[in-house]
Amino acid sequence: MKIAILGATSQIAQDLMLSFSNHKDYDLFLFGRNLGLLNNWIGRQSLDGSYHAQDYSYFNKSQRYDVIINFVGIGDPIKAQKMGSDIFKITEQYDDMALEYLKQHKETKYIFLSSGAVYGGSYQKPVNENTVATVDINNLKSTDW
């Protein structure tokens, strides 16, 4: 199965990639804004040769993916707060890229996840492998998604 992961430098993307690393029938194509950071992470996890780390310019309609998983976001709540509504300009660019792909490949599945949706919006620092999910399901805030 060919899986494109957008926002591959995010903690939740990396957690998923580690869990996928035992599945040899998954062919992962990782896209990130910071390829150096992404390639360093791949090396630290001893996953060299297993994953295809690429710049977003390589994401195009001629590639065939069974699934696109979108983790694109800011990842740092302080940066996100400073950006205000401008954060949507960043995420919109990658959402549009994925949606254009889906128009041409209707069979491709699309999943979007954010740190806020996974961990809740009350975190004060970027998430890491020790972050615990705390979503108050009965009192959701805009930062929870």
Can you describe what each PLM-predicted range is?
Residues 37-48:
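Short, conserved SAM-binding/catalytic segment
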Residues 2, 66-67, 109:
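Structural motif
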Residues 31-35:
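N-terminal Rossmann-fold cofactor-binding loop
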Residues 96-140:
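Conserved Rossmann-fold NAD(P)-dependent oxidoreductase catalytic core, especially the SDR/UDP-sugar
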Residues 41, 78-86, 121-125:
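Conserved catalytic-core motifs of eukaryotic protein kinase domains, centered on the activation segment
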Residues 50-92:
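NAD(P)H-binding glycine-rich loop region in Rossmannoid oxidoreductase-like domains
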Residues 27-29:
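Short beta-strand element of Class I
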Residues 3-23:
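N-terminal Rossmann NAD(P)H-binding glycine-rich loop of SDR-like oxidoreductase domains
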